[in-house]
């Protein structure tokens, strides 16, 4: 069953890519999606040093990345490794000049077998972290093949999530492969345990760590301070 599901997923991904490439001729947004990933492996190989050790962090968009900032800062303190950040959406990547906590920022190549193999071979991550709901089956398979540990943080699961519907057995199998899944609450833990997924720990939400970290920074905005001039504001 799992072999068939893996085959079916790989087939569907390739069909979806082909279909979207056709649609991209008429849709500017989808066209931009593919343009952003054009020559992605050349861009990566030109920027990174293969001799360095890497930690790979993947976030769907800027919001997910913002949650992970305190975690990334702690990783930088603990490991003398280069941190590679990937985004799925354009919202995060467009603001990469503001992102100082990581060493490299790239778009995530589409989750096809060939893309995953090329990407993991290039960056050879010491370990990888996926933020929130970023579960990409072919990347998981390739990380296992590479012998690299990988984790899901800020996980949130409900009993009626799509993970546990049509692709139930397939997705559950992939979730079991994570070295550890850190979830926001006990409800998520219960949902996963009922699906016989045991590699889970309740860690709370990264949002609170993000707020604590933000409070340590200089949050003054000079223009606003000048405008208010210590007046009371409602």
Question: How should each PLM-predicted stretch be described?
Answer:
Residues 1-4:
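Short, Lys/Arg-enriched N-terminal segments with co-localized hydrophobic residues
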Residues 51-56, 225-234:
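Charged active-site motifs of nucleotide-sugar-dependent glycosyltransferases
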